[in-house]
Amino acid sequence: MYEYSFNPNIDHEPGSVESQQSTIYSDSDDSDDSFLDDEVIPPKEQAMRKIEFALADIKRQMDNKEKSLTLRISTSKSHFCLRYTAKRKGKLDRDLHCLHQVYDLLENDKRSTKRELYYEHKAVYGNQKYLDSSIKSICELLNESRANLNILSCGRGIIRGAITFLVENVGVIDARVQEVLITDALLFSNIISEADFILVVEKDTTFQKLMDENFQAMFPRGILATSKGYPDIATRNVLKMLSEKRKFPIYGLFDADPHGIEIYLTYKYGPTKEFAEGRGAFVPTIEWIGLFPTDFHRFTIDQSQCLPLVRTDFVKIEKMIPRSIQLGEIVVTRELDWMIQNKFKMELESINMCGQEYMARFLIAPRVMSIEKEIPIQPETIINEYHEDSQCSLSTDDDREAKDDDYIDSDAEEKFQNMIDNDSD
């Protein structure tokens, strides 16, 4: 390893790092970047070799007093690199500190949260957001996910239900009796659970509403989770681990609007613009069970709960339809088209207006469990009661079947195909 001087008093200017395919390359033809060849090297050792090369190369540039410095893992022109001008010296300082911290984690087989890394060199980073920026840059440089660099995420997601985690150096975390914060530490835990499924809901308000309405009593073998909006990397990683390790079926419940459907696609496939930091953080087995825009007719939701689509909604839908077709998401494509035709959207809360525990009993139970008989209720009586009190009811089987057959016509499909061909995303 090479040592170099840091200046902890450098101003911590905001702004993103300049990054591009390098136009500055080593003037030495015998630079050793053979570790990037197709030899079999453990991922940990490969990442460490990349860091060693990057630090040695940047030291050579500093010794040569080059005006513009380039952080790279190879002399190959095809590899991603980070370039710094004299004005970006503060950013370079932070990125080099981050590289050293990551190397230490890998070398000593340790794991650390972003917050812990920040406090190790608080004087250098100045603010948590600057460390976050450096981590993102380093992940892109090394082409490694955050998890592969032993950096743990303290996500904002929570989980509750029939699952217990045995976490090293922490102990027993029982989600049956308390909400559990979803962090990357759960990825390395032992799991005790006899759950039948995991239900992911978009928002914390829906999560709390279901808990208040006795979700655990209705679904004693169920697990409820939320990322409180846009799905963070830690939540996606943990859900993916649970689906792979324990084969839990995972279902998703989101708003019947463009944003909610986009969140579902992000859970299942990752973001449209993927960065190395979160590579692989998606849950391919998740199944969307609602709220569908077409549920407006299935549950006869009151018209007052419908919100008109605005211009940004139409723009988002037009971008999402080609993607849904490419992904083979027939239901998503159909629901987006229905939304355009009817020009309104709904939030999950709209179905709560139909009555107490209505979402759990008549939306979740039939679609997740398909065992309405196991829930101690009398559907016909309750449906009639809700219909009288709040003008909400289930549609008839004929109505439901008719709506299920409401697919996109051939003209629309041709239009969407043209959108795919011209799509810039």
UniProtKB/Swiss-Prot annotation:
The principal location of this protein is nucleus
**UniProt entry keywords in alphabetical sequence:** DNA-binding, Isomerase, Magnesium, Meiosis, Metal-binding, Nucleus, Topoisomerase
CDD domains per UniProt: TOPRIM_TopoIIB_SPO
Q: Which GO terms describe its cellular component?
A: nuclear chromosome
Q: Which residues form the active site?
A: Y119 (o-(5'-phospho-dna)-tyrosine intermediate)
Q: What is its EC number?
A: 5.6.2.2
Q: Which GO terms describe its molecular function?
A: ATP binding; DNA binding; DNA topoisomerase type II (double strand cut, ATP-hydrolyzing) activity; metal ion binding
GO BP annotations, alphabetical order? meiotic cell cycle; meiotic DNA double-strand break formation; meiotic DNA double-strand break processing; reciprocal meiotic recombination
Compositional bias, Acidic residues, is annotated for 27-38
Q: Which reaction does it catalyse?
A: ATP-dependent breakage, passage and rejoining of double-stranded DNA
Q: PROSITE patterns in the record, alphabetically?
A: TOPO_IIB
Q: What general EC class does the enzyme of this chain belong to?
A: isomerase
Q: Which PANTHER family match?
A: MEIOTIC RECOMBINATION PROTEIN SPO11
Q: What does this protein do?
A: Required for meiotic recombination. Mediates DNA cleavage that forms the double-strand breaks (DSB) that initiate meiotic recombination.
What is the protein name for this chain?
Meiotic recombination protein spo-11
Lineage, please? Answer: Eukaryota, Metazoa, Ecdysozoa, Nematoda, Chromadorea
